[in-house]
């Protein structure tokens, strides 16, 4: 994973772990506006590796830098496949259909209304 600041001691550098080589799968917990994803992709490209797939647990389906979703912008700008385990629409639908999660529906829909693409 990438560091917030480049270190000149210990492992050093701006990433932790093995040097990425060839095609790379990026795994992250959440995709919001795509800022962290763009940063990771650029770091990997600067190390001469090729990010091919960006896999996230939750795609919040937020707008990226423009009117498109962050997912669509990443796909268009970097030619990378973006996949998620679940997205905000599915989470809302699940909450609507399950009594124990009904209390979250209004808040989730409000989030989508404010930030969604």
Can you annotate each of these PLM segments?
Residues 27-29:
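Active-site flanking residues adjacent to catalytic metal/cofactor-binding acidic residues
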Residues 42-117:
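PRPP-dependent phosphoribosyltransferase catalytic core
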Residues 1-24, 35-39:
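Short, glycine/charge-rich flexible loops or terminal/linker lids adjacent to PRPP-binding catalytic cores
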Residues 32:
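Short active-site segment of divalent metal-dependent hydrolases/proteases
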């Amino acid at each position: 994973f990438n560091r917030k600041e480049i270190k000149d001691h210990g492992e050093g550098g701006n990433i932790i772990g093995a040097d990425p080589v060839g095609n790379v799968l990026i795994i992250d917990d959440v995709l919001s506006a795509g800022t962290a994803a763009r940063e990771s992709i650029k770091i990997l490209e600067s190390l001469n590796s090729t990010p091919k797939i960006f896999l996230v647990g939750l795609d919040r389906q937020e707008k990226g830098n423009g009117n498109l979703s962050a997912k669509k912008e990443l796909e268009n700008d970097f030619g990378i496949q973006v996949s998620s385990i679940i997205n905000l629409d599915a989470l809302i639908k699940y909450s609507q259909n399950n009594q124990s999660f009904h209390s979250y529906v209004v808040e989730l829909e409000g989030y989508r209304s404010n930030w969604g693409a």
